[in-house]
Amino acid sequence: MRGYEVIIGFETHAQLSTASKIFSRASTAFGAEPNTQACAVDLALPGTLPVMNKGAVERAIKLGLALGSHIAPRSVFARKNYFYPDLPKGYQISQYEIPVVQGGAVSFFLGEEKKTVRLVRAHLEEDAGKSLHENFIGQSGIDLNRAGTPLLEIVTEPDMRSTAEAVAYARELHKIVTWIGICDGNMQEGSFRCDANVSVRKPGEKLGTRREIKNLNSFKFMQQAIDYEINSQINELEDGRKIEQATVLFDPDTGETRTMRTKEDAADYRYFPDPDLPPLAIEAEWIERVRATMPELPRAMAERYVRDHGMSEYDAAQLTQSPALARYFDDAVKAGATPKLASNWITGEMARRLNAQEIGIEAAPVTAQQLAQLVGRIADGTLPNNAARQVFDALWTGEGSDVDAIIEARDLKPMSDTGALDRILDEVIAKNAKNVEEYRGGKEKALNGLVGQVMKASGGKANPAQVTELLKAKLG
């Protein structure tokens, strides 16, 4: 961008879907009255000790299995020391030197180009409370309901080179954590929060100074914030100034980032092993028990579609955007649909209507069985493609529920009278002398105009492939 290379890395906090907190039995339910879900452990009262939540560990194992990571047989919890009003202990329990999940990668498509972002680690930690600044005059309120909520912080290498790539990575990671059920992915409630580390440099130069954009809680704001930060840093460098390392917040009202604090280094937090928690031991048998509970992963499902149905990797990736979408496709194929045709309709006409109405495929008025019947009629030649959209529309609006009945009621069967079709062909050729001349002169595209005229004259009942062949024969 503007002669600079963009370098982006991500830190994502995924709130784990446990019913209780990571080191206490207090509830993690969202939306309760302030300070009604904070127990003695969360409040750091004297004499309390943390007790590890087994469910949080198993969710971390699931992520490691999903991303091809190494799951550490022994990991250690550490105290991350800093002062903030909503952190009762004066430190956060996290992992530093030996995280539970190490390495791995997230692969995704940017357009039709396959990308891979490497992971450094994913570590377990507790969330802090929340400072409330609204409805208070001259002071702030503290809500400790969130204190101790289990988080998995997922850290990438600085592998992303554009805003689009960064957002695509975040969407893919969001898909994975919700697919395997370790996080509900609700960005509005803070269940999936992303921090983007952004820097720029001239090609071939050493890495530039990075600035961290905190708590991006929507993909739209993520794009706007990263774009603004990139341009801001380039402007600073072009004006001869240095980039200062800092943590910034994005203001969606102004579309700008503002400095929150100068960025700390690890030494500022004075990490040391937590003496109240023993090392976390994860045996191979435990990993295998967790593996047995895992659903088929989107990556494995996409590979199956490529292998069994002869799909492209891109089409397979589109169909595995969510478990519900993949399930719909599988149900259509089980009902007899040709995989390629079913894929085209699901990612084409179906997706267009779902997006327009802002609903998921679970709420689609056309069932997988109805779609299978529809594409079956296209495949056997009973229904031309353009007429198929009329049938789909009737199914979608509820005007009909049986494909064959709709075809019959709307008289959509293809022309069987070859004499009538031949007369239409002759009329179209006679009325479109210019197209005929251009086609005979070597312009293949001119034939498309003639085919379109025949389809229009036949009321969409002619078979386009048959029309094309007949026209070629007539025009020599």
From Swiss-Prot:
GO molecular function terms attached to this record? asparaginyl-tRNA synthase (glutamine-hydrolyzing) activity; ATP binding; glutaminyl-tRNA synthase (glutamine-hydrolyzing) activity
Question: Does NAD show up as a keyword for this record?
Answer: no
Q: Which Pfam families match?
A: GatB_N, GatB_Yqey
InterPro entries, sorted: Asn/Gln-tRNA_amidoTrfase_suB/E, Asn/Gln-tRNA_Trfase_suB/E_cat, Asn/Gln_amidotransferase, Asn/Gln_tRNA_amidoTrase-B-like, GatB, GatB_C_1, GatB_Yqey_C_2, Gln-tRNA_amidoTrfase_suB_CS
| Keywords recorded for this protein, A-Z | ATP-binding, Ligase, Nucleotide-binding, Protein biosynthesis
Please name the GO terms of the biological process aspect recorded for this protein, alphabetically: glutaminyl-tRNAGln biosynthesis via transamidation; translation
Enzyme category, top tier: ligase
Q: Which domain of life is it from?
A: Bacteria
In short, the EC number is 6.3.5.-
The reaction(s) annotated as catalysed by this protein in its Swiss-Prot or TrEMBL entry are: L-glutamyl-tRNA(Gln) + L-glutamine + ATP + H2O = L-glutaminyl-tRNA(Gln) + L-glutamate + ADP + phosphate + H(+); L-aspartyl-tRNA(Asn) + L-glutamine + ATP + H2O = L-asparaginyl-tRNA(Asn) + L-glutamate + ADP + phosphate + 2 H(+)
Q: What is the purpose of this protein?
A: Allows the formation of correctly charged Asn-tRNA(Asn) or Gln-tRNA(Gln) through the transamidation of misacylated Asp-tRNA(Asn) or Glu-tRNA(Gln) in organisms which lack either or both of asparaginyl-tRNA or glutaminyl-tRNA synthetases. The reaction takes place in the presence of glutamine and ATP through an activated phospho-Asp-tRNA(Asn) or phospho-Glu-tRNA(Gln).
Family per record: Belongs to the GatB/GatE family. GatB subfamily.
User: Subunit details for this protein?
Assistant: Heterotrimer of A, B and C subunits.
Which NCBIfam families does the record cross-reference, listed alphabetically?
gatB (TIGR00133), PRK05477.1-2 (NF004012), PRK05477.1-4 (NF004014)
Protein name in the entry: Aspartyl/glutamyl-tRNA(Asn/Gln) amidotransferase subunit B
User: What is the native source organism of this protein?
Assistant: Variovorax paradoxus (strain S110)
What is the gene called?
Answer: gatB
